Every structure is written in structure tokens, then in C-alpha cells.
Amino acid sequence: MIRRAAFAGSWYPGKASVVKDRISGWFHEVATNGVEKVKGVIVPHAGWTYSGRIAAEAFAHMRGMDVERVIVLGPCHRYYTTKCMLTQATQLQTPAGVFEVDTEAQANLNKDGIYGMCRMRDEENEHSLEIELPFVYELFGDKVKVVMMMVGCVNTKQKEMYAESLVPYMKDPKTVFGFAEYIEETGNTICGHNCIEIYLRALAKSGLSVKNEVMMYGQSNRVESFDETSVSYCAMRTSIE
């Protein structure tokens, strides 16, 4: 079963050549230090017009890494769930090519039945995970397998539980993570904060020595009066020390 690239052509380009040129151009603007040891990135999930360049700033630091698995977490916007949901798809479409889903890893994560399985129509109606996949494909092509995790409204106990399930993959040097977030509107609100909390808890439980850095920050609008609002976007990376 394949998950279609439902937002290609609207939230980001639908043609493979345009996607490749856009991402490679953005990557070319990012200064990196050879092959880096990146464990994960936190990137925006808005349309590329608003935040694609900012997302590229973090993803670019994964260039050249020897990776077998990418775990992507993103928030639910379109429907309500109190669980983390895994994909039912076995393949994931992008404009440039198709990923295989790491069904073995998903089964291992869900060995205790703590995850739900997302209905395809709900998953294809959610942009937060899909919009990151072309960056992953540009970095690694179809040599990597992908785990898709849609994060719902989970409580503190659940965050601990999901973080614990991710620890073996956090320790695996050939697994990297991508997290979709942005700072939503004006004020202290983050769309995707549950994803970030699970990630940070898993990092802490793993015992890895890491460094978290803000790579780039941007805004949809420069607020000049109290009547205006703005959406802010941030790209971060976690490096192994």
C-alpha cells in the first residue's frame, strides 16, 4: 500500500526536477563541516514558500551520513487522537521517488500495542510528515527506510512511554530523526511541542552526549503593531559529541 504525495504541487513543488533543484540550491547555501554526526533535526512544517529554506538549513548537515533508517515525527492537524499513530502504508511517495516503510521497526516499536495505526485517508490529509520527505529523499534516496509517526494529544505519562520505545533507535548510529514543528502565531505556542518533548525525553534516556543548536530562525511577517500576528519558524540540529 502506497501513501500518495497528496500535498505535492500545492504546499511544495510537484515535479521531481523542480524539487531537486530547489533543495540542492538551498543545500548549496549551507556551510557544513564535512560529514557530521547528526542524530536529529527539528524543522518547520509550513509550505516551502514560507519555511523550506529554513528546514534545509538543518537537513543539509546530514549530507554524506551513512544512514539506514529515518524516523519522522509530526503533529496531527486534521483529526483528534490521544495516541501516537504509525502508518499503514508500506511505501511512501515523493515527487522524486518512493521510500520503503520500515515495517519491521514499526512492529518492534509497537510490540506492546502502545501505538495506533493511522487510517490512510487521515494520513494523506496531514501535511506535517509528508512535507519533510523530499528533503530526506534528496539526502539519502531510496537506500533508507522510513518510520512515520503522527503524534496526537498525549499526556506526560504517554510521552515517557513513547520516548522509551524510541531509545534503541536513538542509540543506533544508523538511525536519524526528523521532527516537524513551528512556533505558531504570536506568543509562547509551538505547533509540534509534543513531538519535541518525546524526542528530548528519548535523548535523555539514551545517555548520548549531544549538543543542540539553533541553525536558523525566520518569520512569516514582521510584526510592527499590537494588532498584527506572525508565525515563526526555527531549524535545529542535535549533534553527537
Describe the function of each predicted region.
Residues 1-201, 217-222:
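Active-site histidine-anchored catalytic micro-motif
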Residues 203-213:
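Structural signature of cysteine-dependent C-C bond-forming condensing enzymes
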Residues 214-241:
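Long, Lys/Arg- and hydrophobic-enriched amphipathic alpha-helices
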